Amino acid sequence: MKILLIGYGAMNQRVARLAEEKGHEIVGVIENTPKATTPYQQYQHIADVKDADVAIDFSNPNLLFPLLDEEFHLPLVVATTGEKEKLLNKLDELSQNMPVFFSANMSYGVHALTKILAAAVPLLDDFDIELTEAHHNKKVDAPSGTLEKLYDVIVSLKENVTPVYDRHELNEKRQPQDIGIHSIRGGTIVGEHEVLFAGTDETIQITHRAQSKDIFANGAIQAAERLVNKPNGFYTFDNL
């Protein structure tokens, strides 16, 4: 499989290493600013890369969105987070002409976490729910795209829920419809996501901890391996 990388930060550097270990080939890189240290052919436009089988994106909206407005037809794996609604609308449009895969978290374990959460919410309907995510001190966006995905699962199963990001200015008791959303930034934490169900005299916690960023890179590669054989359409872990 011949792979074009969109972005060449820490994550796509891992994708390159792991993909080559699997026998795949990196045919080029698209970056905001070309760098002399990048060990692959650098391009400005997706359509300029004639021999790629798939593109894997671990970048940012500033790099990705202009590329998505260009004319190209290439299977696309997208892991960029930020401006999610705008991104999903654009990817849905592109999926009419090419296979597109999107996940805010490329770990299959996190996908399993969403399924566990979907099963737990109806069973624990009278429990309070708090969501917490923790990441390294260089992560810019908060809350994480994964935590937003977990919140979306809850919204799909409970009525009239309210996200609460900060209780500092709230001078009232917790309301039943509140869903607490908390972000922690520090050190080199790869990624942790926890769902707390708090009931009367008991709590249940469901936690996913990433121990290496390799799980995200491998998840993107595995998605690409499947996507190249798919017809045009929008794909997630649910239908890939």
Swiss-Prot record:
Q: Does the keyword NAD apply?
A: yes
EC class: oxidoreductase
Q: Which GO terms describe its cellular component?
A: cytosol
Q: Which GO terms describe its biological process?
A: diaminopimelate biosynthetic process; lysine biosynthetic process via diaminopimelate
Q: Residues that bind NAD(+), according to the entry?
A: A79, T80, T81, S103, A104, N105, M106
Catalytic activity from the UniProt record? (S)-2,3,4,5-tetrahydrodipicolinate + NAD(+) + H2O = (2S,4S)-4-hydroxy-2,3,4,5-tetrahydrodipicolinate + NADH + H(+); (S)-2,3,4,5-tetrahydrodipicolinate + NADP(+) + H2O = (2S,4S)-4-hydroxy-2,3,4,5-tetrahydrodipicolinate + NADPH + H(+)
Gene Ontology molecular function, alphabetical = 4-hydroxy-tetrahydrodipicolinate reductase; NAD binding; NADP binding; oxidoreductase activity, acting on CH or CH2 groups, NAD or NADP as acceptor
Report any Pfam family annotated for this entry: DapB_C
Say yes or no: keyword NAD present.
yes
Q: Which family does it belong to?
A: Belongs to the DapB family.
Name of the molecule in the record: 4-hydroxy-tetrahydrodipicolinate reductase
Origin species, per record, is: Staphylococcus aureus (strain Mu3 / ATCC 700698)
